Design a protein with these regions (language model features):
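A structural signal for multi-pass alpha-helical bundles of membrane permease subunits
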Residues: 1-244
């Protein structure tokens, strides 16, 4: 439909359909689509990097350190996954409003990172637990500290689970509609989801094929990421979910 002339999604016949790139040209010339794309890419990349750092360090602490309350904290993390995210929407809005973080990427990133932290921490911890502690002990004999062990030993061995965490953290903001709608207000800060929705809504039912073109371009980066990282995704998810 995105390559078909006109504004109709469907055609009565397949013969005689004329293909065109006009809808894609219109996206980048007559709409702020490129700005929405850039906003979403920056937000998704920032969330991926921050989540990787926070999740891996937190999971390493739970996997390798012993401290009071560790078991109860892990159980609390697991229990938090039982509640739907929608239950916290009102509280999130009030907290961000009190902190003057409404209409900021900082507020949105805080929600994304903290929202995925419990599940990702539990998953990565399971993967770290499967890495023999004898490697840590051998490194300590050679004079390595916890930071050196974490960076030079644990992270290289945990590549599959890191790829999985990074991909999930990237696709979350890329595809999300609810949270950006709740937090963002300015047109120049819109993400792809709310940008396309607001633009199509303001133009009634006249641009379905243009919407199809925009939706197709949204799917391209995610599809490519899954194609090139699917081996690591499967390995990381299965290994992180199994406790030995």
């Amino acid at each position: 439909a995105s390559f078909k002339k006109g504004n109709n999604l469907f055609s009565s016949t397949f013969s005689g359909i004329e293909f065109t790139f006009d809808h894609y040209i219109t996206l980048f010339t007559d709409t702020p689509y490129m700005q929405w794309y850039l906003n979403t890419f920056i937000l998704a990349t920032a969330n991926m990097l921050i989540s990787l750092i926070v999740v891996t360090m937190t999971a390493y602490v739970f996997s390798r350190y012993r401290f009071r309350g560790k078991r109860n904290t892990l159980m609390s993390i697991l229990v938090l996954q039982m509640f739907p995210a929608f239950l916290s929407m009102t509280a999130i809005y009030i907290l961000l409003s009190k902190a003057n973080l409404i209409d900021t990427y900082t507020g949105l990133l805080l929600v994304y990172v903290t929202g995925s932290l419990p599940f990702m921490t539990w998953l990565v911890k399971g993967y770290f637990d499967a890495i023999p502690t004898s490697l840590d002990e051998a490194a300590k004999i050679d004079g390595a500290g916890h930071l050196t062990i974490f960076i030079q030993i644990i992270l290289p061995l945990a590549k599959p689970i890191l790829v999985f965490v990074g991909l999930v953290s990237f696709t979350g903001p890329w595809m999300d509609f609810i949270l950006p709608t709740l937090v963002l207000r300015s047109e120049d800060k819109m993400t792809l989801a709310i940008g396309i929705f607001s633009w199509i809504a303001s133009n009634s039912a006249e641009n379905y094929t243009l919407f199809a073109a925009g939706a197709l371009l949204v799917a391209v980066p995610i599809t490519l990421l899954f194609v090139f990282t699917q081996k690591h995704i499967t390995t990381g998810l299965v290994s992180g979910a199994v406790k030995e």
